[in-house]
Swiss-Prot record:
Disordered: annotated span: 189-223, 263-282, 292-355
Subunit-level organization: Interacts with RIMS1.
Zinc finger intervals, Phorbol-ester/DAG-type: 489-539
Species per Swiss-Prot/TrEMBL record: Mus musculus
Protein name, entry field: Protein unc-13 homolog B
Entry's family note: Belongs to the unc-13 family.
Comp. bias regions, Basic and acidic residues: 196-205, 292-306, 324-351
Record field: compositional bias (Polar residues): 206-223, 266-282
Domain C2: residue ranges: 1-97, 595-719, 1430-1557
């Protein structure tokens, strides 16, 4: 990228000078720049342009255009190939080029020109050289330094050499306080103007018809950084304004608002602050200094160049800034309190002050150990610096003294004030010492002031127009030496006219016979009583005029002496006024004294020697009153000067008439008035009658009275029409163009322009010279306080000038508003401007009932100029938006004064919006609230970017005493240290906005809350960065999960504290939980392992301590507490995350529920595994079961804490399932514990059985028998009760209530089952009973045992009394376990299956054998069903016949065959089938038949038929057939192969049945069957019972060889 510099110098045209008004356009690379227009055939522009060139194969196209009324015409064009342009750092004399008429095109690009014209243009084109300085130039600057050092020693400085130095034309010259912050690459813009445009491209005028400012305010594709002539400037994008007092000097300094044509000045008269500042011919002193630093002969690296032509400060590696070690550099100049040479500046138009201090790159400053090159100087460089500084200071002071003497010969580039000079070389602090960054609460954001409002709007041409200033100076003295406010009032007396007399004011007849009007006794003027207040001419002056005309010389002389005395008194009493006027206009004392004499004489001469020619053009009127019945009027105008009266033509039926009529008057009396009256012409009968009676027959529409003395030059003025009397109905305004040629003042500006000159110069003097840049803030109070602009003296000056020369108060206000616009950033100024604009708005917008002129029309009639004021407001609005976009910098929270200015600035914005809406009547101007909101957001965006990029340094400075060095100051995937710091800084920003700025910016409570906007913007930006960072972290996860959790908490706190309640985010599910979800799940995974490890440790500690109770009230041990303490702590972390996303929270709860399940089941498994070993101890098993119960209790609590019914269904189901599992484990532990008492309870029940067996007697119901039964029951229960008493008392003390009930239930079960098993129903498998019978039958040797058993069986069979005792004992045991409500519930005990089984068995004891057999047959319906592994099958046919008479039943059974018999034997296999009829009432009938045996046949055929006779007592459903296949054996019991059962109820319905019956290994029966079998087994004397027990107890015999 190359930098092309083009200087458009001048041109020579062939032709008449009058026909040329030319400007030049430059085009290169789609970028276009334009000069100002200059008249004449030899125009001189002398303007510089700079372009960034990326393609050298193109050319520069130069076009010269002549401005026309409708369109512009081309004079000629020049095309210069870029390859032909020289490279140089210095301007040359330029080259004359001939303009040609046509361009040559190739591939849509210009490649040349043709057809030469006689016109020529002088251009200087060059490419800037690279930053490295040639050795020749380095030697040149070294020589310069030696000269300066020599000058310092000789204490003199050559004025000739000084005069050769050109001023630095830079807008930065106004700035008196710059601050540089080393912000690195983040805030470095290529150009201050374009930077601001890029940042906020819509901060520009919303009014399309306003003239564009000289500086560009719009961006284009590929636009040059300099769309308009750009001065050489310091890299001010690296600067920051300092204090608010100083920063205001960076604002608008001057105006170009009065007349646009004054902007296009020649190089020698260019506005000091104009945008088209000319680049000086050669390098400025700043450039010299910078280049001096850059040169070095020993070849050290030139890391950075700080040239006056560079846009920024670029380091060697391409990054902007001061280097890595420097963080901040502030260079502050002296204030301008002692600018004594300012008057010199007023006279030297081309003089532009450079900044009084330099910001130098660190690398440019040689350290104390470094020295100059040997051939240059042998002394240390620091000494040279000291010489330099002393020399410059002395020269500057000398120049100030010369300037005070008024010698204009020397340039005034050196700034005023002590030590304000170029002390950048040696007086700079040591840059290696790091200065702290500003606090977050006072963040200074880099911004470049847009030049538009500083130059284009604020160029005060009146400060430079010496001719105008000289004239205004005289007029001001004239107005102040004999002010209107001090004029002698008329001495009116009631007067009677003897002849017809007319009013001097209204020219109406003084009606009446006597006392018709008023007459002044001094000057003799006569008028109506109502008109006396309208006469404001000075009585003394009028008397002098009248006397001189009538020859009363003595009287005239007396009056003149009186006026002289009045002026002397005025001069003596108010010397400060005239001193201020002299200082403002920088007039020497001698000239001032002479001028005072001249002015006094002109006042004394009065109007006697005064003469003027007045030309009045009545242009038009607006908003007139409707006087006719048609709702309109027929207006015409009369104009009267002195006694001469003229009228316009009549415009019929128009309330906005246009006349355009010109009248000429001669006036010889400066006290005369121009009376302009508007009339409605009437031609009806009423009008004709009035014409006979009155001089005024037409309707009065309004008037304006203009003092002739207020006229000057050429004026185009709107005047509001005034009433003549209170009864007048008047509205509207009239436009007059007045040209006045006063004798001796033929070529002067209008008084409005003169007033502007006075006001601006006064403002400049009081503010910039006397106030050192500060603006005086009036302290006036009251309705007219806004009309006070200066202190008492200056205010009197402008008021008297305005009063004498007819300047409207609204014009004064708008002029002062324009002046203040250049200082709008000074303390207190926004409030004054806001009040001023509010009153300007009120003046134009608040129409009265007497006028129907719209606000827009009234404003258009403003003498200030509609376009001018609109442009001023547009550019002010633009600058206010830019400043509000950096409100944290411009209005620090730590300054209450600046905060008040911030509030006033917003009020000013609101007033501008009101102006646009009500006065300009724009349809939809930008709402002030939205503008401020956008500005706040823009500032917050910049603030966030700054704190993000400087987070570590800011945090270290604000919150830590010592900075900790970081490997990576920004975000890192290796740690998370950056983010908490950033959150802290964000909070400080939000708090500052909330506490400091929200109360200030409170004008829009419904639309703008700065604290909330701050939180919203900060959160939005933070969320983007945080989300991206965590996505990167998720890939590697180099940090601990706890670190992520801690960050999650901080983010959550930030959101809940500041973001959650924001209106814009309400109702939305926050995103931040999703960023952390994977990290939280990772933490939960790790936490599960920690919890399991902790569980094992807790159990080990508990076991080591012997599972001691945690306290006397707590019945569980420490391990439960420890486990749930750890789980609760983990859950508390999850709960405190307060996850607002229900889906993510559900994921957390599911995962944590799994952790709870694993931990608790692990606990239960360990406890269950070791529990049997602890059952031998008394208390320990109870405590362990209590632990399990406490797990369940705590789990329920945790379930509720996790949400209860609101918990995620999957997590809730998981916890419910876990609760069931724990309940099952507790049941198992209770069962194990209950079973551990089995042996002891067995012993107790056996003792009970022995005692019960000794009970004798019958079971009758006599009282004695009942008492005996109760007593026996007590005796029987004593062994059991002794055991239970001791244990249950212990259990009640040690066990939790729930655990106690479970233990009681298990003991109850064990006791009931044991009593049933031991006392009531001994098991068949015991060595007693049936098994012994079967065994004895098989082995003859056991026959004696069988006999002994049978004897014992008689004793085991319970008698009715024993049953009664046992039944009563059961009731007692039941009451014992109920324990008066403290134990098991009665309903549970009653419905207990164990008790019911026992009682059922007891009830069966009293039933007969037939009844028991019948019950067995009916209840046991599945004895042979469900044979999974049949051992064969038998085919049988059954026929059932019932006798119709007797009801007896006959059953015929035919055994057909057997099939697939599974049997192994070593000997002979001889199977046969045994068929037995089972049922009641069979004792006297044949119950069993057998077939013949078949040898060695596994599928034998029998075909044998048997007949069973059944009684009629029972139906067939009470009987069943039992088929048994056996292997016949001689001399021993037959072996059982298989069994089958066929109930006759299945046959009864059909009457017959034929089927294959599968053979099972044994008979299946339920508890009822077993109980009946046990009871019948004890009836050893009953053959049927014995046979039934044997039959049902048979099972398949053991096979041989198996």
């Amino acid at each position: 990228m190359s930098l092309l510099c083009v200087r458009v110098k001048r041109a020579k045209f062939q032709g008449s000078p009058d026909k040329f008004n030319t400007y030049v356009t430059l085009k290169v690379q789609n970028v276009k720049s334009t000069t100002v227009a200059v008249r004449g055939d030899q125009p001189s522009w002398e303007q510089d342009f700079m372009f960034e060139i990326s393609r050298l194969d193109l050319g520069l196209s130069v076009e010269v255009w002549n401005k026309g009324l409708i369109w512009d015409t081309m004079v000629g064009t020049v095309w210069i190939a870029l390859k032909t342009i020289r490279q140089s750092d210095e301007e040359g004399p330029g080259e004359w080029s001939t303009l040609e008429a046509e361009t040559l095109m190739k591939d849509d690009e210009i490649c040349g020109t043709k057809n030469p014209t006689p016109h020529k243009i002088l251009l200087d084109t060059r490419f800037e050289l690279p930053f490295d300085i040639p050795e020749e130039e380095a030697r040149y600057w070294t020589y310069k330094l030696e000269q300066i050092n020599a000058l310092a020693d000789d204490n003199e400085y050559s004025s000739q050499e000084e005069s050769q130095r050109k001023p630095l034309p830079t807008a930065a010259a106004q700035c008196c306080h710059w601050t540089y912050l080393g912000w690195g690459e983040h805030q470095t813009f290529e150009d201050p103007d374009s930077a601001v445009d890029d940042r906020d491209s819509d901060y520009r005028s919303e009014t399309s018809n306003s003239a564009p400012p000289p500086y560009h305010t719009t961006t284009q594709p590929n636009a040059s950084v300099h769309q308009f002539p750009v001065p050489v400037r310091l890299p001010q994008q690296l600067f920051l304004q300092g204090s608010s007092h100083d920063s205001c000097n960076d604002s608008m300094q001057s105006y170009d608002l009065d007349y646009p044509e004054r902007r296009a000045l020649s190089p020698t008269s260019s506005s000091r602050y104009g945008s088209s500042c000319n680049v000086s011919q050669g390098s400025s002193l700043l450039s010299e200094l910078d280049q001096y630093h850059e040169q070095d002969d020993d070849g050290r690296e030139r890391d950075s160049i700080h040239s006056s032509h560079s846009y920024g400060s670029l380091s060697k590696d391409g990054q902007a800034g001061l280097g890595e070690q420097e963080k901040a550099l502030e260079v502050t100049c002296e204030s301008e309190k002692e600018k004594t040479g300012e008057s010199k500046e007023m006279r030297d138009d081309a003089t532009i002050h450079p900044p009084s201090d330099l910001v130098l790159h660190k690398d440019h400053v040689l350290g104390p150990q470094e020295s100059l090159p040997e051939e240059t100087a042998s002394s240390p460089f620091t000494q040279a610096r000291a010489h330099w500084f002393r020399a410059v200071t002395k020269v500057r002071l000398q120049l100030q003294e010369i300037s005070d003497d008024g010698d204009p010969s020397l340039p005034q580039w050196l700034p005023e004030g002590p030590a304000g000079g170029l002390y950048g070389i040696d007086s700079m602090p040591d840059l290696r010492r790091k200065k702290p960054l500003p606090l977050v609460s006072d963040l200074s954001l880099v911004q470049s002031r847009k030049a538009g409002i500083t130059s284009a709007m604020a160029t005060r041409t009146s400060l430079k127009d010496e001719e105008l200033k000289s004239h205004v100076y005289k007029k001001t003295l004239q107005a102040l030496i004999y002010p209107i406010s001090c004029t002698t009032p008329h001495n009116f007396e009631v007067w009677s006219a003897t002849t017809p007399t007319y009013c001097y004011e209204c020219e109406g007849l003084l009606w009446g016979l006597a006392r018709q009007g008023m007459r002044c006794s001094e000057c003799g003027v006569k008028c109506h009583e109502k008109c006396q207040d309208l006469l404001n001419a000075d009585c003394l002056q009028r008397a002098a005029e009248k006397s001189s005309k009538h020859g009363a010389e003595d009287r005239t002389q007396n009056i003149i002496m009186a006026m002289k005395d009045r002026m002397k008194i005025r001069e003596r009493n108010k010397p400060e006024i005239f001193e201020v006027i002299r200082d403002v206009f920088t007039v020497s004392k001698v000239a001032h004294v002479q001028q005072m004499k001249t002015v006094k004489q002109s006042v004394l001469d009065g109007t006697s020697k005064w003469s003027a020619k007045i030309t009045i053009t009545v242009v038009c009127a607006q908003g007139l009153q409707a006087k006719d019945k048609t709702g309109s009027s027929d207006p015409y105008v009369t104009v009267q000067v002195g006694k001469t009266k003229k009228r316009t033509k009549t415009i019929f039926g128009n309330l906005n008439p246009v006349w355009e009529e010109k009248f000429h008057f001669e006036c010889h009396n400066s006290s005369d008035r121009i009376k302009v009256r508007v009339w409605d012409e009437d031609d009806d009968i009423k009008s004709r009658v009035k014409q006979r009676l009155k001089r005024e027959s037409d309707d009065f529409l309004g008037q304006t009275i203009i003092e002739v003395r207020t006229l000057s030059g050429e004026m185009d003025v709107w005047y509001n029409l005034e009433k003549r009397t209170d009864k007048s109905a008047v509205s509207g305004a009239i436009r007059l163009q007045i040209s006045v040629e006063i004798k001796g003042e033929e070529k002067v500006a209008p008084y409005h322009v003169q007033y502007t000159c006075l006001h601006e110069n006064l403002f400049h003097y009081l503010t910039d010279i006397q106030g050192s840049g500060g603006v005086w803030i009036p302290e006036a109070r009251g309705d007219d306080a806004w009309k006070v602009y200066f202190d008492e003296t200056a205010q009197e000056i402008v008021d008297e000038f305005a009063m004498r020369y007819g300047i409207e108060s609204i014009y004064q206000a708008m002029t002062h508003f324009a002046c203040l616009s250049s200082k709008y950033m000074c303390p207190g100024v926004p409030a004054v401007m806001s009040t001023l604009l509010a009153n300007i708005n009120a003046y134009y917008a608040h129409t009265t009932a007497s006028t129907n002129v719209s606000a827009s029309d009234r404003f258009a009639a403003s003498n200030f100029g509609k376009e001018r004021f609109v442009k001023l407001l547009d550019q002010l609005h633009n600058s206010l938006r830019i400043d509000l976009s950096t409100y944290r910098n411009n209005f620090p929270a730590g300054s209450p004064e600046r905060l008040q200015d911030l509030k006033s600035t917003v009020d000013l914005l609101t007033s501008i919006t009101f102006f646009r809406m009500k006065v300009q009547e724009l349809q939809s101007p930008p709402r002030a609230s939205q503008v401020v909101k956008d500005c706040v957001k823009a500032c917050l965006n910049s603030t966030y970017e700054y704190i993000f990029n400087n987070c570590h340094d800011l945090y270290s400075h604000q919150y830590q005493l010592q900075e900790q060095p970081l490997e990576e100051p920004g975000p890192s995937i290796r740690n998370l240290d950056f983010w908490p710091k950033l959150i802290t800084l964000i909070v400080s920003i939000i708090e500052e906005d909330k506490n400091s700025y929200t109360p200030v910016l409170s004008q829009f409570p419904q639309e703008l809350n700065v604290g909330k906007v701050s939180a919203e913007v900060m959160w939005h930006l933070f969320a983007q960065d945080m989300k991206y960072a965590l996505e990167e972290h998720e890939k590697d996860r180099l940090c601990k999960s706890a670190d992520y959790m801690n960050l999650h908490f901080k983010v959550k706190w930030l959101h809940n504290e500041y973001v959650r309640d924001l209106p814009a985010l309400q109702g939305q599910v926050p995103e931040y939980p999703a960023w952390f979800e994977q990290f939280v799940l990772q933490w939960l995974d790790e936490n599960e392992d920690v919890s399991l490890e902790f569980l094992r440790g807790a159990l080990e500690r508990d076991k080591k301590d012997g599972f001691q109770q945690t306290s006397e009230h707590a019945l569980f041990s420490c391990s439960v507490v420890d486990v749930f303490t750890q789980l609760n702590q983990s859950f508390e972390i999850i709960r405190k995350l307060e996850c607002p996303d229900p889906n993510i929270l559900a994921h957390y709860m599911r995962r944590f529920a799994k952790t709870i399940g694993k931990v608790l089941m692990q606990y239960a498994d360990i406890l269950s595994k070791n529990f049997p070993a602890y059952c031998t101890k008394e208390r320990l098993p109870c405590i362990l079961m209590n632990n399990m119960q406490q797990l369940r209790v705590q789990l329920e609590k945790m379930f509720e804490a996790m949400g209860g019914k609101e918990l995620d269904s999957e997590a809730a189901d998981s916890l419910k399932e876990l609760q069931v599992k724990l309940n099952t484990v507790l049941d198992e532990l209770s069962m194990v514990f209950g079973n551990s008492f089995q042996v002891r309870i067995d012993e107790c029940v056996r003792q009970m059985a022995d005692i019960l067996g000794q009970v004798r007697g019958t079971g009758n119901a006599s009282p004695n028998a009942r008492a005996s039964v109760a007593q026996d029951a007590d005796s029987v229960l004593r062994p059991l009760m002794d055991f239970l008493d001791g244990n249950l008392t212990l259990f009640a003390t040690v066990c939790e209530k729930t655990v106690l009930k479970r233990v009681l239930k298990e003991l109850w079960r064990v006791v009931m089952n044991t009593m049933e098993r031991v006392i009531v129903l001994p098991p068949l498998t015991d060595q007693t009973g049936t098994q012994l019978i079967l065994t004895a039958a098989k082995e003859l040797s056991q026959l004696s045992k069988l006999k002994d058993h049978m004897v014992r069986e008689e004793t085991r069979n319970l008698t009715p009394k024993q049953c009664a005792v046992l039944d009563l004992a059961l009731d007692t045991i039941k009451q014992y376990f109920h324990a008066g409500g403290n134990g098991l519930k009665k309903t549970f005990l009653e419905k207990s299956p164990d008790l019911q089984s026992l009682r059922y068995a007891l009830s069966l004891y009293t039933q007969t054998t037939d009844t028991l057999i019948k019950t067995f047959v009916r209840s046991q319906t599945a004895q042979g069903a469900g044979v999974d592994d049949p051992v064969g099958e038998v085919s049988i046919q059954v026929d059932l016949f019932t006798h119709p008479g007797t009801g007896e039943h006959k059953v015929t059974v035919k055994v057909v065959a057997a099939n697939d018999l599974k049997w192994q034997t070593a000997g002979m296999f001889r199977p046969f089938v045994e068929v037995t009829m089972v049922g009641p009432h069979q004792s006297d009938k044949k119950r069993k038949f057998t077939t013949k045996s078949k040898s060695n046949n596994w599928t034998p055929k029998y075909n044998e038929t048997f007949h069973f006779l059944l009684g009629n007592e029972e139906g067939p459903e009470a009987y069943e057939l039992q088929i048994c296949v056996k292997d016949y054996c001689f001399a021993r019991e037959d072996r059982v192969i298989g069994l089958a059962v066929m109930p006759l109820r299945d046959v009864a319905a059909k009457g017959s049945c034929a089927c294959w019956c599968p053979l099972g290994r044994k008979i299946h029966m339920d508890e009822t069957g077993m109980t009946i079998l046990r009871i019948l087994s004890q009836r050893s004397n009953d053959e049927v019972a014995r046979e039934f027990v044997k039959l049902k107890s048979e099972s398949r015999s053991t096979e041989e060889g198996s």
